[in-house]
Curated annotation (Swiss-Prot):
Taxonomic source organism: Geobacillus kaustophilus (strain HTA426)
Pfam entry (one): Ribosomal_S13
Record-linked InterPro entries: Rbsml_uS13_C, Ribosomal_uS13, Ribosomal_uS13-like_H2TH, Ribosomal_uS13_bac-type, Ribosomal_uS13_CS
Keyword Ribosomal protein: yes
Quaternary structure and interacting proteins, as annotated: Part of the 30S ribosomal subunit. Forms a loose heterodimer with protein S19. Forms two bridges to the 50S subunit in the 70S ribosome.
Record protein name field: Small ribosomal subunit protein uS13
């Protein structure tokens, strides 16, 4: 397994797919990286030369990926919660942040249902 940005990427897959195992690199970014490095997308990781791997590592090193990106995202969320804006309040309460309805759905954000006891008449 080749190691890029602290992540072991699978050897038997195509390079463009293997790069997506790194947090912060999706398919479009992987394609741009390979184009800049001058590596074909169809190449398997096991067939890469050390020189090609070095070029890919250098390009990925310039991007914000893995731990740095995770830290930035969590700090952004923490900042929103501290300044008390609407999005921060939604994060604090564990509700959807982007305006989705919460009457019926939003179970992923709200967690499992908590049944409320009915008042007897």
């Amino acid at each position: 397994m080749a190691r890029i940005a602290g992540v072991d990427i699978p050897r038997d897959k195509r390079v463009v797919i293997s790069l997506t195992y790194i947090y912060g690199i999706g398919k479009p970014t992987a394609q741009k990286i390979l184009k800049e490095a001058g590596v074909s997308e169809d190449t398997r990781v096991r067939d890469l030369t050390e020189e090609e791997l070095g070029r890919i590592r250098e390009i990925v090193g310039r991007l914000k990926v893995e731990g740095d990106l995770r830290r930035e995202v969590s700090l952004n969320i923490k900042r929103l919660m501290e300044i008390g804006c609407y999005r921060g309040l939604r994060h604090r309460r564990g509700l959807p942040v982007r305006g989705q309805n919460t009457k019926n759905n939003a179970r992923t954000r709200k967690g499992p249902r908590r049944t409320v006891a009915n008042k007897k008449k």
